[in-house]
Regions:
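A generic structural signal for well-ordered coil/turn residues at beta-strand boundaries
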Residues: 281, 285, 376-377, 388-391, ...
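C-terminal, active-site-flanking charged/polar segments
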Residues: 357-358, 370-420
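Conserved Class I SAM-dependent methyltransferase catalytic core
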Residues: 28, 244-249, 309-382
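Conserved nucleotide-binding/hydrolysis micro-motifs of P-loop NTPases
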Residues: 43, 190, 246-248, 273, ...
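Flexible, solvent-exposed coil segments and beta strand-coil junctions
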Residues: 297-300, 358
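Conserved S-adenosyl-L-methionine
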Residues: 160-287, 292-294, 303, 307-309, ...
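Non-catalytic, mostly N-terminal accessory regions of nucleic-acid modification and defense proteins
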Residues: 1-174, 178-179, 265-273, 363-368, ...
Length: 505
């Protein structure tokens, strides 16, 4: 079981996924999402009607004059009837919706219906109607969507590395997002980082009585009651993400909405292109950008100073440009950025150390992206724009709480992560001068002398313990004595074997 969900829910979701096994994973997820959203649209409409009744206000249903498009009206139709109703009536109707007050409606208006088999639709509707999938809370919806994303390996299908949830948690704890932040992921993929930031802020702003855990340790029922008059800003002007792919843009929107974020600002645009002109806008950026994507240099932003073949160099400069003064960032980069001394590698590091305060370099182990991706050496860089670097805190993660192999079996699920967070928060008050340990400080001047090398092993001091084997003459005599013992034992064994042969004769 993954994501600590109940076995009965996992079983039903697996059945749902199997129904769409002939589709590519992204298309399958979209079709499942559209069906779930159609059900939620009627539920949202019913809630608004009840609220209006209680407040003695007039209310026009979004389904007015189109009642046959309500989930409850067609969900129990026969196979032939349901496929015609959904294809020929429901989907043409939802594409005409323009009521921005309905959070599900505006993301259904561009939906396309691609289910051709009537039985697939009938069985999918039955599963979506099950009690296990209808707790009517963002916690359950979020778990459902997170499970679907993982089982369908959406990021892998789109040639992206899924950042494990516990590594996302680590990065969030290092930059501490707040409701006052403007948070961006310029390469957001499924929106995983933004969703985690949303949950973190919600938890930080929920009173203890509203922070509950189920039997698997999942936190739920977060009310965010301390947000008070900041709710509107939190929902509308806090989270921003961008994707090159239209399908991934839609997936990210659905993911965030299923987790409870009502108005995610997710756009389809290449943030390296000239069409994307934002700068100095965000107070927090958290991401895992593509390392080796090809870059269309003929359509690249004009404010870049690097000229490279690999996309990671452009993304690092982009992140710097997007941050406001005092803005923070946690970003995953390949090891080559850390130790590289070529022109572009050095230029990017000079930028992050001369015009930002590079707070930390955290070395991750090779298997961190298994089982979702390949073995790759990476680091987390944490920096703050606008202050020059005086010293950099290095940490080598030896364990992340899972076995370091392709199976990635859970040990405790955390490994060094709590220690990293604790020591990072105490780095200005504790002594980190001992470079024989797994974390230490290195001054900017020393790093500069080493051509801006940011690799952990460059500064780690390894002390080899001296082993005293004693007097060499005595050691040789011991070896001779040992060999004599072996020889004598061999002769005794030979005598015994010869004796057995004579007796048998």
């Amino acid at each position: 079981m993954i994501f600590n969900i109940k076995p009965e829910l996992e079983e039903k979701l697996d059945e749902l996924i199997e129904l769409f096994s002939t589709m590519n994973p992204t298309e399958a997820l979209e079709q499942i999402s559209f069906l779930i959203f159609l059900k939620r649209l009627e539920e949202e409409d019913n809630k608004k009607a009840n609220d209006a009744l209680l407040e003695e206000k007039d209310f026009d249903s979004i389904f007015k004059d189109n009642e046959g498009c309500q989930w409850s009206k067609w969900a129990n139709m026969s196979a032939d009837a349901i496929i015609k109703q959904v294809r020929d009536v429901v989907f043409p109707f939802i594409r005409t919706l323009h009521d921005e007050s309905f959070i599900y409606a505006k993301y259904l208006k561009n939906a396309t219906f691609n289910i051709e088999n009537p039985q697939t639709l009938v069985q999918a509707v039955k599963i979506i109607n099950l009690e296990e999938l209808n707790k009517k809370d963002s916690f359950t919806d979020g778990l459902i969507y997170k499970y679907l994303l993982s089982r369908l390996n959406i990021e892998g299908q789109n040639k992206q590395y899924k950042t494990p949830d516990h590594i996302v948690h680590l990065m969030i704890e290092l930059v501490k997002p707040t409701v006052d932040d403007s948070i961006c992921d310029p390469t957001c993929a499924t929106g995983n980082f933004l969703e985690a930031c949303y949950q973190h802020i919600l938890k930080q702003n929920s009173s203890p009585e509203f922070i509950k855990k189920d039997e698997y340790g999942n936190v739920y029922d977060l009310k965010g009651d301390k947000l008070e008059n900041k709710w509107d800003k939190f929902n509308k002007n806090t989270f921003y993400g961008f994707n090159v792919s239209q399908s991934m843009t839609r997936v990210a929107i659905m993911n965030l909405m299923m987790h409870g974020l009502q108005n995610p600002n997710i756009q389809q645009i290449d943030t390296l292109s000239r069409q994307y002109e934002e700068a100095n806008k965000y107070s927090l950026i958290i991401c895992n950008p593509p390392f080796n994507n090809k870059v269309n240099t003929s359509d690249i932003r004009t404010d870049f100073t690097v000229t490279a073949k690999k996309s990671i160099y452009y993304y690092l400069e982009l992140i710097f440009n997007l941050l406001t003064i005092g803005g923070r960032c946690a970003v995953i980069v390949p090891e080559g950025i850390a130790f590289g001394i070529k022109k572009n590698e050095k230029k990017v590091k000079e930028l992050l150390m001369n015009y930002a305060r590079l707070d930390a370099v955290i070395k991750l182990h090779l298997k961190i992206f298994q089982p979702f991706g390949k073995d790759i050496s990476t680091n987390i860089l944490v920096f703050t724009k606008g202050e020059p670097t005086e010293k950099v805190w290095f940490y080598e993660m030896e364990s992340d709480g899972y076995t370091i192999d392709k199976k990635r079996t859970k040990i405790d699920g955390w490994g060094d992560i709590p220690d990293i967070i604790e020591k990072f928060n105490k780095r200005d008050i504790e002594d980190f001068s001992d470079r024989t340990k797994k974390c230490f400080f290195v001054t900017f001047e020393e790093i500069k002398k080493e051509n801006y090398d940011l690799s952990f092993n460059k500064y780690k001091i390894i002390r080899y313990e001296e082993i005293n084997f004693g007097d060499p003459k005595e050691l040789i005599q011991k070896i001779i004595n040992f060999e004599e013992q072996i020889l004598n034992t061999s002769k005794e064994v030979e005598k015994l074997l010869n004796g057995e042969r004579e007796n048998n004769a």
